[in-house]
Amino acid sequence: MLWTWVRIPPPPPNIMKKILLLLILLLMPGNIYASAPVIKGLNILKVAKKDLAQVGHWKRTPTVVICEHAPIERDNVREAITWWNKRGYIFYHSIYLRGSRSTETCNNPDPTGYITINLVTQETFEAGDNLAVTHFYVDNDTREIHWAKIYLKSNVEERVLEHEFGHALGWMHTEKVGHLMNEKLIYGGWGDAGLKKH
């Protein structure tokens, strides 16, 4: 039997880059972003991830509280609040860092009127590739959000806090590529279609 060796030239550089990018995307863990928000009070609700959906709204203007061990700086929180301000959402500008009011609010299981930012604990977080989780309470009859608790891992990636504020404002995940509320960090972006307050 006679063997003939044929040499195949390597693909052009632009094709090689696309192949490498595809391989990287396929090998990355799929859920590197945030776990689905934990909604308390609201009856079970099916929301299609393809469509952006808001399951609740704030009647009162929420106050943001940075809890004692939260892995985020005050300036980062201000930037995230400003991002949402530009889309029509209002927050009280008081951001408590220390003191009895902050501790009391952060330890309250029902911090009505507040969005708290905390470091994750074993009770609030599932193991895996998730970067953050938000718990919030929605009144079943009025769809009013009473409170929200954002839990962050110690290494906060870009866009994660803005994404979690989206959950604190009642927004669910979407599959839209490039959108802030996309569940996966690699497919998300700063897109805000549908997020502007009317």
Q: Model-flagged regions — what are they?
A:
Residues 4-6:
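Short, positively charged low-complexity motifs
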Residues 19-28:
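Sec-dependent N-terminal signal peptides
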Residues 63-73, 149-156, 186-190:
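Second-shell loop/turn segments in exported
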